[in-house]
Amino acid sequence: MGTFNPFTLEGKTILVTGASSGIGRGIAIACSKMGASVIVNGRNEQRLSETMSEMEGDDNLSLAADLSDNVALAEMVAKLPKLDGIVHCAGIGQRVLCKQLQESDLENMMNVNFKAPVMLQTEILKQKKINKSASIVFIASIACDSPTIGNAMYSASKGAIISYANCLALELAPRQIRVNCILPAMIWTELIFKGGITEEELKEDEKKYPLKRYGKPEDIANLSIYLLSDAAAWMTGSNIKITGGGS
């Protein structure tokens, strides 16, 4: 008797952006363990190599490119095979009070967190690099509707990508291509240390969560596996919060 596994990714080719660290790295590694052929993208070739060294399988591929550069983006897409799954995970964070916002800060945040994934997805569709019945996952954030001081730019960028993804889900539904968003709360990655908060303060804050901890990249990876697998064949246009019980 065969083993029933509705979450297998065997036979699927999946692109993961932002795979050089954090959540993206965790997702890439997990997808490879579930049998997928994984293409990892990030700006730092050395860190992508570190991700590749932790992945399983011998048919994975690393494509370093700055997705905020339209030329580099188009060249990378041209190298892609047909995809069965895409995880848009590349992103940055920066805490700045509203009265101290600089236009350059806003442009950088929106370019990386919103424009780059939108234009990447556009180019993938234009070059017909995605298969029917594929799955697209955007890593957003509960910050979109959970305001905190100094987080206006980041919150707005994640709210924008969720709105885009919800529209994309409707447009691609006739081709059975599914589009969903994951909205994590605090996850232990390098990103959370860039807000000027100490590790001690973060460890004290995580005690406020009902499950008494922040999330780990693996927690987000496991949900991503579900959305990428055929087990989620009837799920599209959803925005899934994963928060350890926090609001």
At which residue positions do the language-model features occur?
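Short C-terminal tail/terminal secondary-structure segment
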Residues: G2-N5, S146, I225, T236-S247
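Residue(s) in the substrate-gating loop at a strand-loop-helix junction
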Residues: S141
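Substrate-binding pocket helix/loop in short-chain dehydrogenase/reductase
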Residues: L97-C98, D105-M110, E201, D205
